[in-house]
Amino acid sequence: MVREKAQVTMGSTTMDMLEDEVVKAQDRRWRLRLRNPWACSAYTLVTTALGFAAFFLMLQSFLTKQLDTKGCEMVYMRPMYSKFDDFDTEHTRFASKYSLYLYREWGIDEEFTVKGAPVLFIPGNAGSYKQVRSLAAESAYHYHNSVQHESNAGKGERRPLDFFAVDFNEDFTAFHGQTVLDQAEYLNDAITFILSLYHTPGRSRRDPHLPDPTSVIIVGHSMGGVVARTLFTMPNYQANSINTIVTIAAPHARPPVSFDGDIVRTQNAVNSYWRSAYAQDSAKDNPLQHVTLVSIAGGGLDNIVSSDYASIASIVPETHGFTVFSSSIPNCWTGADHLAITWCDQVRKSIVRALYDVVDVSQAMQTLPVTNRMRFFKKWFLTGLEDIAEKTLPMTTEATLLTVDVDTAILPQEEQLVLRSLGRSSPNIKAFLLPVPPRDRGEKIFTLLTNERLDGPGEHGRLEVLFCSMSSAQSTQSYLTHLDFAGESPTATKLACKNAASDVIILPESTSHSNFPFRPDQAPFSYLQYDVRDLAQHQFVAVLDKVAHHSAGWVVAAFSASSEATVKVNPSLQRLLYTGISLQLPPRRPLTTEISIPALHSSLLAYDVHISRQKCSQGELFAPLLRQYISDLYESKFFVNVEDAMINVHGRGRPTCRAALSSKSPSNGLSLQIWADPTCDSSIDVTLKVDFLGSLGKLWMRYRIVFAAFPLLVVALVLCQQFRTYDATGVFISFAQSLNECMYSSLPLAITALTFLSITLATAQMQSKKLQALGGPASIIGAFFDNDNELLLGSEDPFFWFLVPLFGIMCTAICVMVNYVVLILTYLFATLYALVRSNRLLDASGQRTPDAFAVTSTRRRIINTLILLSLISTAIPYHFAYVVLCIVQLATCIRGFRLAKEAQLDTNYNFYNYAHSIFILMLWILPINLPVLVVWIRNLAIQWLTPFSSHHNVLSITPFILLVETLSTGRMVPRVRPGISLFTNVFLFAIGAYAAVYGVTYAYVLHHLANILCAWLVAIHFDTLGLAFEDSSKGVAVVGGRSEGKKRP
């Protein structure tokens, strides 16, 4: 009996031991799984694969799809520069850092004395003063060859343009707000010095009867355009010393990067200053009342600064400036990349000719009044087809007396004039009169297209167009020109006429041999378009064929109903995406047809357009010509001899860009204007479809900053899961395992919540715009809900809700990649570290012993920290210290990984996983600090040692220093009580939420949020407030390989 009881007891004990072993084995497997740094679940693997597939498709689309053709002509010049050495420290405190130069063109103007109107060129980010040479050389040649021989009739008195340029030693203004302010201060001093040259004996050869200049014309490239607008906000700005600014590829709407707080605050302050100035009720209260600003953008070829940011619609009213794309500029018609736009021959010629037209050296301000300046800027930079384009016909005098035989010259009402070959008309019929229809017959437009240049008053060319009315009884001597096409006809009638050449619109030539609109060897078309209301004072349109012999010139002209010339397609955006647009233009149609699609206004979508070729029995006069345009930024693109065209736009719907001022007319979306030969009696099929793959590439230029900010949301959620598990179980799981767990819990919830938030914000933004458009009290309510497109991805269309999960997947994939790259580097460096120290880690018996963290004395650590902080407060920016801390933290990770592998203790693995995760967090904060560090290093290279006060704030780096220094001793963070762990979650949630909602616009704040988190972790480490468990000190300090804790199998 006793024996049986003993056997039962032994069996029970054995079973208990077996159960304990099973539990221990399960616990070991659980701990092994949680601490595996290479863990990757199937869900994580699929998400990573999808993320990288989308990312590489986006890059492939950006590099190969929907690309504009490069059409800039190369330029040549023979530059000469003169440095103003006497512009020294007596004039500016930046004399040792920056320099001022005067440009002259060798062989044209070699005298380094001022003689005309001053123009100051401001280079952009890392730009050179030598970039002025293309504009200045063209200015010298244009004045030498043309301007000095032209009449000043209708214009101001003109002299050569004196081009000055500043050498900023290739400063990085895009990264550093203080550099922008320094350059602005220097430029104001330079302007004062430049103006003083014009009344300095020996420096000026200006005509004595001309007044001394009191203002300078500014041309700014890239960030130089932003600096130009900053000049007005500086204390040393001299009132009215600037009244004309032309910027090229300048990011006016937003800073190109938001990693530096100073650049964000500076540009926001400058934009607010300009908005408030133009918002004044009285012109006397507006310090910018005499200032005009034209912003020229390069379009899709600019891969450095998105041309969306070149918009000044939210800063300057249309009365004082506008934004235009180089593809819209007459005789240019091509996009340009960020650097090419400074030397592009077509662009520089338009800029120089516009500047000469607005110059008036007889005035002290050196320019014409604002209204005249704007008229000439519109003439040179806009197509002439825009709503704000001004017609000069009403202001033109009747300078031509035309005598015609009305019996043979007048065409029947509503008949189309077609001259297929100029010079073939009967000798008795050289003038063709189209009767202007009465206004009571509905809305009409007059259009005329020809491949010939239209003659101006008194010119003896090949074709002239006049708008005529019956001559009054005034003397014929008052007319400048007399044209007699009637001979001895008894029905001769005299008509008083105005010449239409000043309103001609230049269009690129489109024939069956045309390939691109910007070919310099092609003569452009001449186009006229008037609303019949503009012709109310006239009875006839006279087309004069002045060619004596048969020629290849042709003319098409007619009055047509406005309703026939406009087709409005207004389906929803969703329907357009699924089915596209298909429509047919009838055989009998006007010369030009405009297709308006209000739903297509987003710059995030790209489209493919196909236009079928029409059949012509007599042959086409010209091939179809397509113009795509969007009125928000006056962006036009022309496609000649078109069958297939790639359409992409900039404008409304652009992310993180503020809406236009109230004076700006609402957008009509994408419009397609087609010129097709109306003599061909055949229909034209037009189809438009969304290019989904091409659209994907548009995300890169608009959302590059997302890939620096959004991953911090993922990192914050991973850290939150790690601390939650550690405080509950004592196991600090690996970053990879925590990411796996987040894939099933917090990450999908966060992305879903952000998706709904994006829909809510976009809907509120749309409603806000509608309410503000109504005016009155509704506009006040609308302004309250207006978020200026600063939140999340900045889109104002709820349709793009899918961008949040799309970027969430891509950023998660990037986080996975970065984690594994860091692991690989840690493994490689740890292996190398072990090989170097292998001979030093043998005990007395020759056996290897685990490596140990070297623990310095507290006094020495305090001294080192104080020395570093003193250097930060005086000599080095905290961004430099942050980079050093990242290197130190990487070394800590390497040592922690090696120790964990050798000691195989749970506490060592806890510490390594903790140190690794902190390093991942610091690594994602690193890009925010690098740009300012680059600026500091650049200043050291040019021996500029003046510190920037905003970058020596020790509080911005002290928590990072203390945390990294603590981790370098191998000290593990203690576990905290459940109530206290809530604060850790709150700090991490704040980082993640801010990164997602505000990270794109205010990325620099993420450094400070991470700094606060570090301060909290330092407080937990030192446990000065009793935050940790009472037994938290047991097994948490990693001191060599003698740490307590469970040993891993």
From Swiss-Prot:
GO terms for cellular component: endoplasmic reticulum; endoplasmic reticulum membrane. It holds the Pfam family PGAP1. It is an enzyme of class 3 (hydrolase). The active site is at S222. It comes from the Eukaryota. The chain crosses the membrane at residues 39-59, 699-719, 742-762, 798-818, 867-887, 917-937, 944-964, 986-1006, 1009-1029. Its EC number is 3.1.-.-. GO terms for biological process: GPI anchor biosynthetic process; protein transport. GO terms for molecular function: phosphatidylinositol deacylase activity. It is found in: Endoplasmic reticulum membrane. It is a multi-pass membrane protein. Keywords: Endoplasmic reticulum, Hydrolase, Membrane, Protein transport, Transmembrane, Transmembrane helix, Transport. The keyword Endoplasmic reticulum applies. Its main location: endoplasmic reticulum. The keyword Amino-acid biosynthesis does not apply. Belongs to the GPI inositol-deacylase family. Involved in inositol deacylation of GPI-anchored proteins which plays important roles in the quality control and ER-associated degradation of GPI-anchored proteins. This is GPI inositol-deacylase.
